[in-house]
Curated annotation (Swiss-Prot):
Zn(2+) binds at C29, C209, H234, E238. A motif ('HIGH' region) lies at residues 31-41. ATP binds at K269. The lineage of its organism: Bacteria, Pseudomonadati, Pseudomonadota, Alphaproteobacteria, Rhodospirillales. One of its GO terms (cellular component) is cytosol. Its EC number is 6.1.1.16. Its cofactor is Zn(2+). GO terms for biological process: cysteinyl-tRNA aminoacylation. The gene is cysS. It is an enzyme of class 6 (ligase). This is Cysteine--tRNA ligase. Belongs to the class-I aminoacyl-tRNA synthetase family. Its main location: cytoplasm. It is found in: Cytoplasm. Keywords: Aminoacyl-tRNA synthetase, ATP-binding, Cytoplasm, Ligase, Metal-binding, Nucleotide-binding, Protein biosynthesis, Zinc.
Length: 459
């Protein structure tokens, strides 16, 4: 089965074939680093991490580029508000972003360019746009002239009036058309700025990604991804800048993940339902957060709920229980490739819900397996499938023991309680043994008695 992806540009599911056989180039818009990533930021990171893993399985060479936006008015505002230097803000929040997405089992991209390291490339692209008649300088600004591009709006398919409303354009006397957007803007002495032919200034948001993708993937590449909120104006304007400056097609496939809500409502600080990734990591394992987000198809809106997170953790409990039962069996010879049905699900426009349903089936088959080779083969199939989704990398015991609540018992306390319970049972003091079990249960620890002794997990 070929890889099929929903292409926002064509509004259809198209068969994907790399521009250069065997080599895939993918660009995904990364974070603006001024604060901790929220759960809406996490969804595209997880979605495109799964796509990256799939592409690496299917093709010998994949180059994944995800940028860091470290020059932006939001960063400037945060620096003014806090008094902290901009460089300190961007370094600190970039490190926090890496820490948080690492906890979600997301691989690092092959290249992670910073906007501030590509100012020269941005200026060069703007100069080409001016020379070709697609941009003009006015009062220290440089603007893209949307009227000069015949098919501007092809990605979002909006009318000019809709585009002006959707972009919340700034009405300015120096604009030739209300829809013209900023490529370069002047900087006062208290703001970051770079020397340019138009005076000291800084780039607009859209030109940053056009310049960085050109530098690291070339004029035309395979896949450009991001959240649905970026279709317009950001991705529309990237297409305009890149195709007009380079005279060649830009990205061939455009993939966008759907909106994120929280308990059926738009996430908002005013509604009290705004969560950072770190907020959730303080409550639940990153693997459970990741699985919860993959239970809905990436192209659809996703409703984050406490119940959904609980169900994701229960699913991982079942999967790790199956692996715990064969912990002593070596599956190294069988972990190469996920079963065909799992690959088929993901090759059908990243159908992660279907792939997850196959994980349940694989775990069930593993539980019923007999014989060492059968168990090794089925264990390998489950692990390979989980790894393709960024799941099941932990030792089962580590998963069940987890981190626990801040006020919960330590591992040493739990082991001591299990030893005391075993002694109570040995002396037939069953009331004391039951009391210990109930005390641990009340503190979030579940004991499981088996032929090999007592194991435990945090509930």
């Amino acid at each position: 089965m070929p890889l099929v992806l929903y292409n926002t540009l064509t509004r259809t599911k198209d068969v994907f074939e790399p521009l250069v056989p065997g080599h895939v180039g993918m660009y995904v818009c990364g974070p603006t680093v001024y604060d901790r990533a929220h759960i809406g930021n996490a969804r595209p990171v997880i979605v495109f991490d799964v796509l990256y893993r799939l592409l690496k399985t299917l093709y010998p060479s994949v180059r994944y580029v995800r940028n860091i936006t470290d020059v932006d008015d939001k960063i400037n505002a945060r620096a003014k508000e806090s008094g902290e230097p901009i460089s300190a803000i961007t370094e600190r929040t970039t490190a926090m972003f890496h820490e948080d997405i690492g906890a979600l089992n997301c691989l690092l991209p092959d290249v992670e360019p910073r906007a501030t390291a590509h100012i020269t490339q941005m200026i060069a692209m703007i100069e080409r746009l001016i020379a070709k008649g697609f941009a003009y300088a006015a009062e220290g600004h440089v603007l893209f002239a949307v009227g000069a591009m015949a098919d501007y709006g092809a990605l979002s398919r909006r009318s000019s009036d809709e585009m002006i409303a959707g972009a919340r354009v700034e009405v300015a006397p120096y604009k030739k058309d209300p829809g013209d957007f900023v490529l370069w803007k002047p900087s006062s002495d208290d703001l970051p700025g770079w020397d340019s032919p138009w005076g000291r200034g800084r780039p607009g948001w859209h030109i940053e990604c056009s310049a960085m993708s050109l530098q690291h993937l070339g004029e035309t590449f395979d896949i450009h991804g991001g959240g649905q909120d970026l279709v317009f104006p950001h991705h529309e304007n990237e297409i305009a800048q890149s195709t007009c400056a380079n005279g060649k097609p830009f990205a061939r496939f455009w993939l966008h993940n759907g909106w994120l809500m929280v308990e059926g409502e738009k996430m908002s600080k005013s509604l009290g339902n705004f969560f950072t990734v770190r907020d959730l990591l303080d409550q639940a394992p990153g693997e459970a957060i990741r699985l919860a987000m993959l239970t809905t198809h990436y192209h659809q809106p996703f409703d984050w709920t406490a119940d959904g997170l609980k169900q994701a953790k229960a699913t991982l409990d079942r999967l790790y229980t199956a692996l715990r039962g064969v912990a002593d069996i070596d599956a190294n010879g069988y972990e190469g490739e996920a079963p065909l049905e799992v690959l088929a699900a993901l090759k059908d426009d990243l159908n992660t819900p279907l792939a997850i349903s196959h994980l349940h089936e694989l775990a069930g088959a593993l539980n019923k397996a007999t014989g060492l080779e059968d168990k090794a083969r089925r264990k390998g199939a489950l692990l390979a499938s989980g790894h393709l989704l960024g799941l099941l990398y932990q030792d089962p015991e580590a998963w069940f023991k987890g981190t626990g609540a801040a006020d919960g018992p330590s591992d040493a306390e739990i082991e001591a309680a299990i030893t005391a319970r075993a002694e109570a049972r040995k002396s037939r003091n069953f009331a004391e043994a039951d009391r210990i079990r109930q005390d641990l249960a009340a503190r979030g620890v579940v004991l499981e008695d088996g032929a090999g002794g007592t194991t435990w997990k945090r509930g």
